[in-house]
């Protein structure tokens, strides 16, 4: 089952629904037509808080919709390509873990390429690179394995098909495709999976390793989630999905979720050791190796149309806008494609 939140051209109010074939259908409509009534399908918060009962109820009316889609009227179902897909759940918290070691190694190499002569950042980056190679500390009895993460800007969450304003402070805007899990509740921790595109400004990143990522990660519409919340039965093995990034119609990056080092139960255990996650908490596992400009030192230009596709999870689209004015001086050499924005 693919759960969605969407708006239509006639209504700006978010609607909680499901995908039935190629249609976005409100769960309220399906319940009414199927003669069912569950208090847990009114919105994503209620759905997540009441798993697994809510999932069973949603699947029941979704099955009815598959059989009777033709009976729904014009204002009861909507072509997917005619609605605006929002982030698939009302997000309670957004955490981003670093559980893809090869991406971290690749990133350190590219960052060091440009920062090696900087006395402020080079020692820190070298220490980071050395830490990646260090043996893991011995487990502490009674404590889950510590896993590195940072907390994301809740004010910059966006859904599918958004245009990302190009920040004036960067010449290297980048995608970061990640597998994300949505937390349900203690009865059913895994509500499902979605795509997380953690858009990043690379030429300011090295300066923020100590205090935390601000300029690097907190740009408008920089935390993209979607296009659906896919339940586990449709995902299969979430840790063995092909990933492709298409830019302007051409495949640019490819990777796999098989390089994620830990599973959902591991991140839930570590978060729960400090405080239990709330329903609707979204956790990114880490950037898929080989799927960013930073991995290859090969970046995306302004105006690009981008499609991030995860096998079984769908395609999350965005566009990098053209800068609206002159860009600020970059800490790194300016790429030829960006020269015109610095004149």
Task: Tell me what each language-model feature is.
Residues 263-301:
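A conserved acidic, glycine/proline-rich C-terminal tail/linker
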Residues 37, 207, 211, 215, ...:
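Glycine-rich active-site loops that engage anionic ligands at enzyme catalytic sites
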Residues 1-35, 208, 215-229, 258, ...:
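Charged, cofactor-coupling segments
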Residues 248, 285-286, 311:
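Generic beta-strand/beta-sheet core signal
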Residues 4-8, 39-247, 251, 339-343:
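Active-site microenvironments in enzyme catalytic cores
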Residues 16, 180, 274:
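Short, surface-exposed charged micro-motifs
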Residues 154, 199, 288-289, 312:
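Acidic, glycine-rich active-site loops and adjacent beta-strand->loop/helix elements
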